[in-house]
Regions:
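Glycoside hydrolase catalytic-domain context in secreted enzymes
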Residues: 17-306
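Short amphipathic alpha-helical "recognition" segments used for binding
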Residues: 6-8, 188
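Bacterial N-terminal signal peptides
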Residues: 8-15
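Positively charged n-region of N-terminal signal peptides that target proteins for export
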Residues: 1-4
């Protein structure tokens, strides 16, 4: 009996050590993702397209919450270093300083994520996907969220934004990204705040669009390799930004070659059809069908979005 067990031992060890191909670390991340997608059912894929991604236990996929913030330090996850607001950092006119700030932020975020994961906790503000920087142009001082921006100048905003992304994501020579940064809010989103869910940008000249509002986003995509872009609440030329073929497909994907994640702002898809939004679609089903053509991730912020 002992001799038989010894004969079978190599085979048993081989079976025990075998793992799905998509978990082979020697493969590129893109190849591993491609192999993993083939294993997922349609229902599982849909569940992974929301900010609160559900686990797929049979494939070893743990839950993940995409929502995390690092506007000027790791936010809402216990103690962390608090740096000046972006508008203050912009006043330094020092891109290198901004890089050093967000390199430190990414160190803290990584450490916190490692700790939370070791405790089996995957809640909001504990992940590695930071929804920053805000590279909208601060044109009107009445806009309450202007402090989140790097000011009114597209060039300065571009330089600062590029350094934020590089500080958060790390160098491109690594096998994995340190974190994900997210360029937001795409596009032409600079107030007013009170009607951001229904405001439509119209009569904007092509020159103003390309010289004022788009340069920071283009720089973050082409120079910094930002991994995520968040579409805005407002409409652009009659289409909700999160359903705008011109913004998300023609400009972002085709013209700039962005191949990362496009996600909606918090609850933006509900604005496609609800009474206080754009009323561009009649119901949740048609709104979702339109959104999914352009989006990789849909943010669900409350009960009204789950209709």
């Amino acid at each position: 009996m002992k001799r038989k067990l010894i004969c079978w031992l190599p085979l048993l060890l081989l079976i025990g050590c075998s793992q799905p191909t998509y978990r082979t670390t020697s493969l590129t991340p893109d190849k591993r993702a491609e192999l993993l997608l083939k294993e997922l059912t349609l229902e599982e894929k849909v569940a992974l397209m929301m900010d609160t991604s559900q686990p797929v236990e049979r494939l070893g996929i743990k839950p993940y919450n995409w929502w995390n913030e690092a506007l000027h330090g790791v936010a809402r996850a216990g103690l962390a270093t608090v740096f000046p607001q972006p508008i203050g950092m912009a006043a330094s006119f020092s891109p290198q300083t901004v890089y050093e700030v967000f390199n430190a932020v990414s160190d803290e975020a990584r450490a916190k994520n490692t700790y939370y994961a070791s405790q089996g906790s995957y809640e909001r503000y504990q992940g590695l996907t930071m929804w920053t920087p805000t590279v909208n142009i601060y044109r009107d001082p009445r806009w309450g969220r202007g402090i989140e921006t790097y000011g009114e100048d597209p060039y300065l905003t571009s330089r600062m934004g590029v350094m934020v992304v590089k500080g958060l994501q790390g160098t491109n020579d690594g096998r994995y990204d340190k974190l994900h940064a997210c360029a937001k809010h795409f596009a032409v989103h600079s107030g007013p705040e009170w009607n951001r869910h229904s405001f439509n940008v119209e009569n904007l000249s092509t020159r103003d669009l390309y010289e004022t509002y788009l340069p920071p986003f283009e720089a973050l995509v082409k120079e910094a390799g930002v991994k995520e872009v968040m579409c805005a609440y407002n409409s652009f030329e009659g289409e909700p930004c999160c359903g705008s073929n011109r913004l998300l497909m023609q400009i972002l994907r085709n013209d700039w070659g962005f191949d990362g994640i496009v996600l909606s702002d918090c609850g933006a898809i509900a604005d496609f059809y609800n009474e206080y939004g754009h009323k561009a679609y009649s119901d949740a089903e048609s709104a979702s069908a339109a959104a999914v053509l352009n989006l990789s991730l849909i943010h669900i912020s409350g009960p009204r979005d789950r209709q």
